[in-house]
Amino acid sequence: DTANDPKYGSQYAPQKVNADVDQGVXXXHPEL
């Protein structure tokens, strides 16, 4: 999941992280 990947995590707004969660990409997002 990109939210936990140092290459991507901080680039994405919370809305992107939430979209990933909705798609079932992964879990455990410290940014939420």
Swiss-Prot record:
Its EC number is 3.4.21.-. It comes from the Archaea. One of its GO terms (biological process) is proteolysis. Residues 1-32 are annotated as: Disordered. Signal peptide: none annotated. It is found in: Secreted. GO terms for molecular function: serine-type peptidase activity. The keyword Protease applies. Keywords: Hydrolase, Protease, Secreted, Serine protease. The keyword Repeat does not apply. It is an enzyme of class 3 (hydrolase). GO terms for cellular component: extracellular region. Transmembrane segments: none annotated. The active site is at D22. Belongs to the peptidase S8 family. This is Secreted proteinase.
